[in-house]
A protein has these predicted regions:
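Secreted, periplasmic, or luminal enzymes acting at the cell surface/secretory milieu
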Residues: 40-174
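Hydrophobic helix-and-loop "lid/oligomerization" segment in the mid-to-C-terminal part
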Residues: 1-53
Length: 175
């Protein structure tokens, strides 16, 4: 979406990619050439169609004057994409608001029970977002080892330190 479509005083009832852009994108996919959706946006969008039809989505938000160089380095494999989402992307605007580590309805859908009447879960979509807070992929793989905490309990306003052994098990550098 354009920068004028997000931010203060820029509310939209649909969080889909604008129709003219989706039409162009569908035409590009018809060519049979490899296509990557490079997503310039200032907010989470609903991308279920794109996720189902596109082999790769790179969310770049709105970058600065050198963004094109950085995006090119990622697309051509010079560097590894390593960002994680700072916001949750919904499947549908009806799921909004979505919060990290919170159930999004009063009584969420039970595993394996798609339709339950008289519950405040969604009847037409599951409870999971399209992309949760912290989601992100990489050109490499990692193994997470044991986690240790510096204490077994924490007071209300306290803090703790967690340590984890992280090993890059892939053939590429990554973060």
């Amino acid at each position: 979406e354009s920068s004028e479509m997000s931010g203060e005083s820029s509310s939209r009832t649909s969080l889909d990619i604008p129709d003219v852009q989706r039409t162009l994108f569908k035409e590009l996919l018809k060519t049979g050439k490899p296509v990557v959706l490079v997503l310039f946006t200032g907010r989470p969008l609903t991308l279920e169609w794109e996720q189902a039809h596109v082999p790769a989505i790179l969310n770049v938000w709105f970058g600065g004057s050198e963004a094109a160089y950085a995006i090119g380095d990622v697309l051509f494999g010079a560097i590894n994409p390593s960002g994680k989402l700072t916001m949750t992307f919904p499947k549908n605007v009806g799921q909004i608001p979505l919060y990290y580590a919170h159930k999004n309805t009063g009584r969420p859908l039970h595993e394996g029970k798609w339709f339950e009447k008289f519950r405040s879960n969604y009847l037409d979509v599951d409870n999971e977002p399209l992309y949760p807070f912290g989601y992100g992929l990489s050109y490499t793989t990692f193994n997470y080892g044991d986690i240790t905490l510096d204490r077994t309990s924490m007071p209300m306003d306290g803090s703790l330190t967690a340590k984890v052994i992280l090993t890059n098990t892939g053939s590429r550098d990554g973060a």
